[in-house]
Amino acid sequence: MLFPVYWMLNVSLTPQQDMRKSPPDLLPLHPTFEGYRAVLNDQLPYLGTSLLIGLGTVVLTLLLAAPAGFALARLRPYGGGLLGLVLLIAQMIPGIVMAMGFYGIFLDLGLLNSWWGLIIADSTIAVPFGVMIFTAFMSGIPGELIAAARIDGAGTLRTFLSVVLPVSRNAIVTVSLFGFLWAWSDFVFANTLDGGGDWRPITLGIYHYIGNNNQEWNAIMATAVVASLPAAILLVLAQRYVAAGVTAGAVKD
């Protein structure tokens, strides 16, 4: 399972002249950091764009998904079950189908080749998932906690902000991580909606090294290594919260 990671690291340290050796070296005999120097020289703007889009997606997703999940879990509006079904179906729509629909809409709105356009597009994937996670988690919050807040005079908004959100840390971390990783690794929306713009994320920046007659594989793999680090670090740091957030609501007392 870890072989692709090992091979990615191996190729990122292999000199260009050794790329076509047959059989290939299992370890780089003459390691070089040329690929990583290329990343620092060429890819930092793309990494910055990916970070901006990822954080923007997280913020927009939380702003929309947390209140919606609270409403479905605690306020139980009319048609809430149907809305949950719609959100589930939305998760099944292929990304390329949504990208083609977004292209026409964004063309009319002037959102093509913009970072905020990609934030909106990526959020359409993260928000339905976030609503389902928040709904499941907030359904498990003891009703006595909500009732106590109401007795103390808190309205619906105050209860949500001061009581429900503070105890929903696991769900917030889970949804934030999913939204960030989706936006960070997205290629379909980026290539369709921002293929020729100045705000290209790292998933498109890697193509800087690929041409008809030239493939700088050590730079490509070095870029992949650097781009994988934020995702790996976040997963390691947040795995405890993710496990709790995903399983919340699955087991009832």
Stretches with model-predicted labels:
Residues M1-D253:
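A structural signal for multi-pass alpha-helical bundles of membrane permease subunits
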